[in-house]
Amino acid sequence: MKIGIDCRIYGPKHTGIGRYVQNLVENLLIQDKENEYVLFINKDSENDFENLKLKIKNSFQISNCKFQIVFTDVSHYSLQEQLLLPKLIKKQKVDLMHFPHFNAPVFYGGKYVVTIHDLIKHLSKGPSTTTRCTALYWLKYLGYKIVFKQAVKRAEKIITPSQYVKDELIKLYKVGADKVIVTYEGVDNKFQANTKYKILNTKYKIKNPFLLYVGSVYPHKNIERLIEAVKLIDKKLVIVCARNVFRDRLNNFIAQNSAEDLVTFTGYVSNDELARLYQEAEAFVFPTLSEGFGLPGLEAMSLGCPVICSDISVLKEVYKNAAVYFNPLDSKDVAEKIKLVISDKEILEKLKKQGLELVKEYSWQKMAQETLKIYKEAA
């Protein structure tokens, strides 16, 4: 079988979905010696794929894999994506296509599988959730709803990263339960801290002790409540955020709350640097209002970093008893739970132990195996 994968979002610079695609591709190439893969990528991911080629060259495990790379230069959420991408895919004569994000082209007529990571745009919407003018926002939102609905309707199979997303999808779109399959994401067992802390101290002006948040600062991430919480207990917060969207709005909020001395933004960091930050942090704090899975919390646990997070359904499903939960709408409760964890060595050690045990349940290898099974069923 000839399987196409849309890899235009690939690697850690594209946050959670980029990590998902990278780990899916690498593990499929390790495990699958029967099928041929066509990877559609954009030029800005070329270096990431050079690293993949190097891994293949140096690894006996994936030396016999069959794949080819097709450069597209088609932007996400663009008119080109709807009109040009289907032609590029058709030219490769794939038997099955995997779109690892909701944006499957409406005009693509072949068989495909789609991954729906979350329903955040359904739940967090309106002018307050955008930096664009209101008219343009609603136009793009209409386009999003059309593309999303078509993807859900026409896909042979739908992959979700959690039972929570599956249940919400079925509720909103009346999809048959057998069409939607949960494949939990994983934690990279090569995710290790090789960077010396002194380098981070010099580069980002970070001083111990500090709390850590990793992810975007979109409105649904609820960072304002976290900033209010650290202000209440006078704790330093490091925010690792690769994208600048909503940074200006958040900077204004920080200034209004006189929290400039407490909050440090690092921008994009390498995997090594991120691993070191997880290891050095007193705790990883995740105040999000909506998620599809919650990968950063598992990354934190894998490196012995205690997790304190929102008491929302999906995080309870994924993190189970390995986290301390708070009401994300109440900054006082956020502050109290942070203080409770970091001031009690017994709780800290218990969370570290439970976190390290929990991450053993989540494997990229297992996720790839389950995805390959879905491909076979869909074709």
Regions found by a protein language model. Give the residues of each.
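Carbohydrate transferase catalytic cores enriched for Leloir-type hexosyltransferases
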Residues: M1-A379
